């Protein structure tokens, strides 16, 4: 609403494992029951887990949590998306991005490591997801990952999807929530290395998961 950016530590969420745990805990703590999902008081949370961008198989998905736009009870729901948005968020140094309030005009959120800006999106408002991705990639750089909504989200269709990395979707009506906030897209680039406490344990976990994945498809 006032186009400000703040940073909060994630230490209070250590007991809530992964992006799903962090996202749902934030929603539970900060959005009262009965909130209109399309109101400025609702929030939308993009969150990643501790293994994101470490190379562990299946650890690259991103949780997007908000209030349901397509059920009458408006409970907290979460969508899960692949693509590169999760790795970009993690390598930029963030565990979660929480968006609240609503803009009076179309905007997009640009995250370049620690540099966070809210920028005008008039030039791409009304465009589809692919055209928006191409336009913002040309403007900001092709090494940014773009997660965007299209006209369905802008017009608050309850089943509208967010699309990131050109063709990876996230449903649960999250795009309608972004549309209600006049938030056209997240544009994210991360360049920071990811460190783990026990690299050998992570490597062993990756090997184990790869064996299990290959074995489960060896008919």
Predicted regions and their residues:
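Intrinsically disordered, low-complexity segments enriched in small residues
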Residues: 1-80, 84-219
